[in-house]
Amino acid sequence: TCEIAKEMGAEVIQHEWPGNQAEQFNWLIDNVSINTKWILRLDADEYLMPDLIAELNEKLPTMDEGVSALSLSLARAYCGKILHHGIVNGIRIVRIFRTGKARYDKRIMDEHLSILDGKTIEMKHQFVDDNRLTIGQFTIKHENYASREAAILLDAEYHLSDTSKLEKDHGEEVEKKRAQKAKYAKMPLFWRAFGYFIYRYIVKGGWRDGKEGFLWDFLQGWW
């Protein structure tokens, strides 16, 4: 990724991995001189849809100064196909914010931006998380996620770390997602993974995305 970015003319800054995305991005905010009004956080396997690029080009130059962050609609692609069914649609994430107006909260995963001041507005069009991992790579990645989720659940149950300084206001959708995870953790072991897969694939219609939808929901549900 770094070599491709350099070839395309981008300035590449590297920093030793601190163990989680939140600390890495906050290091960037604190230590790198950023001379743009807005920051876009985009992973190597993500891209903006042409309609979103056009929308941003139209709205950013005249954006109200009271707006500090933009919430983008997330689309997911797996095995080269954009998924349209299941629970992949309707998710919104703040990925664009004014320089100096936001930081990531300190979590080992499921990190979210805390907007320091100003309001957040929604953009109409989507960006895409284009997952190109093999099944083997996918399961290894999600085993790592599962270990970190387990650590978060143990921390929440036994109060192993001080969470009093964490920002609480991440928006209704983020808090809803975390509440759902807490509810899931209280469900019967093993059965909850099976139930989650059935919910995603049958109830929410993931089956309508064909074999890509089955693989996506099966791997997400069981891993």
Question: Each predicted region: which residue ranges?
Answer:
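A short, glycine-/small-residue-rich helix N-cap motif at loop->alpha-helix starts
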Residues: 16-23, 29
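Acidic donor-binding segment of Leloir-type glycosyltransferases
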Residues: 1-14, 18, 57-60
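Alpha-helix termination/capping residues and helix-transition junctions
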Residues: 7, 33, 64-66
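Catalytic-site signature of metal-activated, phosphate-bearing donor transferases
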Residues: 22-26, 49-223
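Active-site nucleotide-sugar/metal-binding loop of Leloir-type enzymes
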Residues: 26-38
